[in-house]
Amino acid sequence: PYLGQLPSGETVLSYESSSKYTLKIGDATARNFGSAYQPFSGGYWGSFCIIDSHTLVGTNIKAKEGPVQMAQFVLNHRIDAVKRKVTIDGNNKEWANTDHALFVGSKSQAQGTLRCSYDDDNIYFLLEVLDRNLLASDYASLYVSPVSNNKLSKGACCIQVTMNGLKNCEIYDASWKEAQLDAQVKTYVCNETNERLIDDYGYIAEIAIPRSKLTITSGQVLVNFSITKRNSLDAICDVASTSTARWIPAVSYTHLRA
């Protein structure tokens, strides 16, 4: 077995179980661990290396004298919102690389990150989508929920964006219903016609949601994030479920006062 600890405190354990490489995430004392994750089909003698605060690389030998399997894994956990004024123009210049981010992108070449900021009037979100085959029908969905009893409740909202801008806004009231949130959305497509590329191609989306439209409790909201490409959906948490138990807290050190 291999055991490591990320800077944020989470411990990572890797071991072989029934000839499968297995990972578990544990608490800071390495005493309590979550469910097992088995990313490779089989093999033996696996190990991992922590790359940075949110990334590790796991390796495993497929079979005797076979190829080495290797994969990168990204940790999604609570993100801290930075207080700043953001101009909604599709330019990410106000945002810093050190901002906490959530990551989606295990099912296809399309990947996305989500960051959060706020000021006295709005909560801001930055979506950066890397996609080398971007289609007008592809979209990203941002879900925001009050901190409640682990269930979707009135006050939750969903904003969908494409590379061309706002696609749809919905609020939750027993079911998802189209609504006006007064959200501002601006996108910027990154391709061979400009210099602001995200690695190769993709788009940037900046979103501002008025604080008056959200229910903020003790400086927190819960967020979920998904990207949809050619009807294939990749998300942090199951978007069809009404449970928010695994949604990610977005937290302000100074509290996002409602």
Language-model regions: role of each:
Residues L3, L13-S14:
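Hydrophobic strand positions within the blades of repeat-based beta-sheet folds
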Residues L3-P7, F48-I51:
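Structural signature of eukaryotic scaffold interfaces centered on beta-propeller domains
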Residues G9-L13, H54-G58:
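Entry beta-strands of beta-propeller and related beta-repeat scaffolds
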Residues S18-I25, K64-Q72:
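Structural motif
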Residues N32-C49:
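Conserved blade-ending motifs and adjacent loop-strand segments that build the rim/top face
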Residues W45, G66, A71-N91, T98, ...:
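Acidic/polar low-complexity flexible segments
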Residues G90, N122-V129, A205-I209:
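Short, well-ordered beta-strand segments enriched in hydrophobic/aromatic residues
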Residues K154-D200:
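Glycine-aromatic-enriched beta-strand/loop faces of beta-sandwich-type recognition domains
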